[in-house]
Design a protein with these regions (language model features):
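Hydrophobic/aromatic beta-strand patches that form the interior of the parallel beta-sheet core
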Residues: 82, 105, 141-143
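Short, well-ordered coil/turn elements that cap or connect secondary structure elements
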Residues: 35, 76, 99-101, 137
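Short, flexible loop/turn elements at secondary-structure junctions
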Residues: 44-46, 62-64, 85-88, 110
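Accessory alpha/beta interaction modules
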Residues: 15-26, 81, 86, 91-99
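Non-catalytic C-terminal interaction segments of nucleic acid-processing enzymes
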Residues: 2-31, 35-40, 48-52, 124-198
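Short regulatory "switch" loops immediately downstream of catalytic or recognition motifs
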Residues: 61-69, 109-121, 146-148
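Active-site beta-strand-loop-beta-strand hairpin of nuclease catalytic cores
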Residues: 53-81, 87, 95-99
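Short, charged, amphipathic alpha-helix that recurs within catalytic cores of restriction-modification
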Residues: 85-133
Length: 198
């Protein structure tokens, strides 16, 4: 009986994680990628034919040109990578965290951010990032989902449970990303985005 309850709890947990992941992904698309002049792709595969353990996939990748009227403006564009993480367990799953852009963000819940705070401060997260994704940039920020009319400080004190059915939500940057250098060529990343599509 206990084993059945444990299996059911794991199944419910997985469903909750899946719902939260979908919610965060849809919110990101709605907030950051809608409108004209937005260049982005979902589930961008990098090195898909590499040996086992080497292929990378970025949940969302965006190309932000400096302008669109001159080639030089396009060449000055930057890449922003977004990794969706529903909970702390998801962060440490060994999947994702492929920070290949000049800017990179973890998109998560306030609850998950609060659980990660100590690991961010004491270097636990940095060590994990280096172990599971050695080519990833340490230039990353964190965005959290908060109810539309809420202040981020209030949400930090008393997080609202994610509920896609009720109310409007927004993404707020709780940890800024300082841009870093990209190691992959622009042509390669644009090709990977094009191959992945939406």
């Amino acid at each position: 009986m206990a084993a059945i309850k444990l299996r059911q709890r794991r199944k419910d947990d997985l469903m909750d994680r899946k719902k939260i992941t979908n919610f965060l992904g849809n919110l990101l698309v709605q907030e950051k990628f809608s409108g004209m002049g937005k260049y982005w792709a979902r589930e961008v595969s990098i090195d898909p034919w590499a040996a086992k353990g080497k292929p990378k996939r970025v949940d969302f990748m965006q190309f932000v040109p400096d302008g669109q009227c001159a080639v030089s403006a396009i060449e000055r564009g930057i890449f922003v990578c977004y990794e969706i993480k529903s909970c702390k367990k998801d962060v440490y799953s060994g999947n994702g965290l492929n920070f290949l852009g000049e800017k990179n963000y973890i998109v998560t819940t306030m609850e998950c951010y609060k659980e990660l705070l100590q690991d961010l401060r004491d270097g636990t997260f940095a060590r994990h990032l280096y172990e599971v994704a050695p080519g990833s940039s340490f230039h990353f920020g964190i965005m959290v989902a908060v109810p539309f009319m809420s202040e981020i400080t209030d949400e930090f004190e008393n997080p609202t449970k994610i509920d896609s059915e009720n109310g409007r939500w927004k993404l707020s940057v709780i940890k800024q990303c300082n841009p870093g250098l990209r190691t992959r060529p622009m042509a390669e990343l644009l090709f990977c985005m094009l191959r992945s599509g939406h």
